[in-house]
Amino acid sequence: MRIDKNLPNYLTIARIMVIPVIILVFYINNSLARTLGALLFVLASITDFFDGYIARKYNLVTSFGKMFDPIADKLLVGCVIIMLLKKDNVDEIPCLLILAREFLVSGLREFLALVKVSVPVSRLAKVKTFLQMFALSILILGSKGSGIIYLDIVGEIILWIAAFLTIITGYSYFKACKKYF
């Protein structure tokens, strides 16, 4: 698989490469490091929007991008969730729901691609992704990084909403596969 030299592919690669940096600064455990980690996560999350937008608008869609963009998204979200679970006592249930859905949907998407069925990303799924990224940004920063006492609680509430939407939006993939079971 050849990586075409184009901006969307570089943004996808950058999103993957920033993950260890986010984790590293998170474990430094001071307010400046937390702020930097949250900022890096926000920037990485924003690249998720721009890589797809630029690829479609300027006809720069590649096989690499189609394959690795969702992988980069899952790696970013999954690594941050695991990091938060280990270090900050974030509620496990919404985290596990999000992780389980992402793995299942990734498998279903691969299966659907084999049988030549495409399930478009819904607006609700885009809202789900935004809320996941927003909640995780808040939780990375947390009360320790911001000095805002209840910021962790706000992040957890948004994470629960994102988990609920995660389950709802995952259903469309199961529905598309139903006739193959």
Swiss-Prot record:
EC number assigned by the record: 2.7.8.5
Membrane spanning stretches: 8-28, 35-55, 64-84, 148-168
Pfam family, one: CDP-OH_P_transf
Gene3D superfamilies on file: 1.20.120.1760
Catalytic reactions of this protein: a CDP-1,2-diacyl-sn-glycerol + sn-glycerol 3-phosphate = a 1,2-diacyl-sn-glycero-3-phospho-(1'-sn-glycero-3'-phosphate) + CMP + H(+)
A GO CC term attached to the entry: plasma membrane
Compartments (UniProt record): Cell membrane
BP GO terms, sorted: phosphatidylglycerol biosynthetic process
GO molecular function (one): CDP-diacylglycerol-glycerol-3-phosphate 3-phosphatidyltransferase activity
Coarse class of the protein's main subcellular location: membrane
Pathway(s) served: Phospholipid metabolism; phosphatidylglycerol biosynthesis; phosphatidylglycerol from CDP-diacylglycerol: step 1/2
UniProtKB keywords: Cell membrane, Lipid biosynthesis, Lipid metabolism, Membrane, Phospholipid biosynthesis, Phospholipid metabolism, Transferase, Transmembrane, Transmembrane helix
Role, per record: This protein catalyzes the committed step to the synthesis of the acidic phospholipids.
Family: Belongs to the CDP-alcohol phosphatidyltransferase class-I family.
NCBIfam families xrefs: pgsA
Stated name of the protein: CDP-diacylglycerol--glycerol-3-phosphate 3-phosphatidyltransferase
